[in-house]
UniProtKB/Swiss-Prot annotation:
The keyword Transmembrane helix is annotated on this UniProt entry: yes
Protein name: Potassium-transporting ATPase KdpC subunit
Topology in the lipid bilayer: Single-pass membrane protein
Cysteine pairings via disulfide bonds: none
Record's GO cellular component terms: plasma membrane
Subcellular location: Cell inner membrane
Protein family: Belongs to the KdpC family.
Transmembrane stretches, start-end: 7-27
Function, in words: Part of the high-affinity ATP-driven potassium transport (or Kdp) system, which catalyzes the hydrolysis of ATP coupled with the electrogenic transport of potassium into the cytoplasm. This subunit acts as a catalytic chaperone that increases the ATP-binding affinity of the ATP-hydrolyzing subunit KdpB by the formation of a transient KdpB/KdpC/ATP ternary complex.
UniProt keyword terms in alphabetical order: ATP-binding, Cell inner membrane, Cell membrane, Ion transport, Membrane, Nucleotide-binding, Potassium, Potassium transport, Transmembrane, Transmembrane helix, Transport
Amino acid sequence: MLNQLRPALVLLVALTAITGLAYPLAVTGVAGALFPAKAAGSLIERDGRIVGSSLIGQSFTGECYFHGRPSATTAADPADASKTVAAPYNAANSAGSNLGPTSAALAERVKGDLAALKAENPGRPVPVDLVTTSGSGLDPDVSPEAALFQVPRIARARNLPEDRLRDLVAGQLQGRTLGLLGEPRVNVLALNLVLVDLAKR
């Protein structure tokens, strides 16, 4: 019986070592050598400190900043661990809300967001990504339309010409990956960092 088990055990140990240790270490080493910034998390550094990642969205709420998509991520309620509370862009709990199209709670949230955005920019259609969450709740990008929609609010808050802000958006525009995958987009963190630099001048 031991003769029959030995090949299976040897194969189990060998495949575990190859697929669980050697392969991940090799891929990590190659990624670190070829793409060091991406392998380290695509972190963005300013003045010697890390301010975020280009892959994970952040919550910007001030009137003078570009805002990302709504985030449905949650965290444990400090008062009652059996419940959750809203925690936008919580990377430790990446998920959507799982609210379906017939959900009254979802309809109420979208209605409130739409009303606020229409009041901010009357007469203009609200881009859909400013009222819908992504599947992960951590989307770092918005559509060019969503970024441009916010220009009048930021121009008023910062006392800047709208044309200058539109130029900033155009400068941060990323096209489709490989020319055909995904949609054109603007990274909100990168755009806000450029905006802060502009305000310092």
